Design a protein with these regions (language model features):
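Interaction-mediating elements
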Residues: 1-113
Length: 113
């Protein structure tokens, strides 16, 4: 039940979104212990983002999850997400922010967990 939304200045094809989704699901399983059946991803490409006054290759990733993941898990996930986006989208790791938003209120299938 994490929702992982990636905003980036880079243009993404459908096939790139599909491959990123597969990798994000793998990373989420490894770092947070959440399987692919519970992961939702979103992509907002061609976003108007600026970092250090520059709008070149930039990304902002939001990880919203039910419950609070461990600090070790989120630290590991940040490293892997930055590595993924750097490799796949040529975004420098120092131009990527990853923010975590845990919540105890998460709804699915008509009710809350």
């Amino acid at each position: 039940m994490p929702f992982i939304n990636t905003k980036t200045t880079v243009s993404l094809s459908k096939s790139k979104k599909d491959s990123l989704t597969a990798e994000i699901c793998r990373i989420t399983r490894e770092c947070l212990g959440k399987g692919e059946n519970w992961v939702m991803t979103g992509f907002e490409d061609n976003a108007s983002l600026f970092f250090q006054g520059d709008s070149a290759a930039v990304a902002y990733v939001e990880v919203k999850s039910f419950g609070t993941p461990s600090a070790a898990g989120t630290s590991q996930m940040t490293g892997k997400l930055c590595h993924l986006l750097s490799g796949e989208l040529s975004i420098p790791a120092d131009h990527i922010y990853v923010a975590y938003y845990p919540t105890d209120n998460w709804g699915w299938n008509g009710s809350n967990f």
